[in-house]
A protein has these predicted regions:
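Structured soluble/peripheral alpha/beta segments that form catalytic or ligand/cofactor-binding pockets
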Residues: 1-148
């Protein structure tokens, strides 16, 4: 994924979700420099291992809140509503902890600053599955300068 940052996109939001009904979702939302979604794609994996491709127009991920980093001053999305119409799923994705930002102040190799962490997932509807996952957010904060 690092090539996306080098090639000039604004960053990405990456979701890896495992539901307790043994289905999984991998979703990538790429953003342009202005912050608009430039691409959205991924895979939905059924319990039998069958993979359903998620392409343009077949999913939506919308932020439901924000978190302001006390470390870098960056504002990150915090909480999401993910809609998968073909799978008839609406997922509410919530960070298990707000402060999961990775930054490297004073490091020889500073690298990009990003947010990545554990999330809880709830599916809309009575008796619907719940799950857990992992979200990675890049492009919301400038890199921390290295010490060299």
């Amino acid at each position: 994924m690092g090539d996306f940052v080098i090639s000039g996109t604004g960053g990405w939001d990456w979701f890896s979700i495992q539901l307790d009904n043994n289905t999984e979702l991998m979703l990538y939302v790429l953003r342009d420099r202005a912050g608009a979604t430039s691409a959205l794609f991924g895979s939905f994996i059924m319990p039998d291992g069958t993979v359903q491709d998620i392409g343009p127009g077949s999913a939506r991920a919308e932020s439901t809140g924000q978190w302001l980093s006390p470390h870098t001053g960056a504002t990150y999305p915090s909480g999401w509503l993910v809609e998968l119409p073909e799978q008839q799923l609406v997922l509410t994705v919530t960070p298990q902890l707000q402060d999961q930002e990775l930054y490297f102040p004073g490091a020889v190799f500073a690298g990009p600053t990003y947010w990545e962490g554990a999330v809880d997932v709830h599916v809309s509807g009575a008796g619907s599955p719940t799950g857990v996952g992992y979200v990675e957010l890049t492009g919301y904060a400038p890199p921390v300068p290295s010490s060299q």
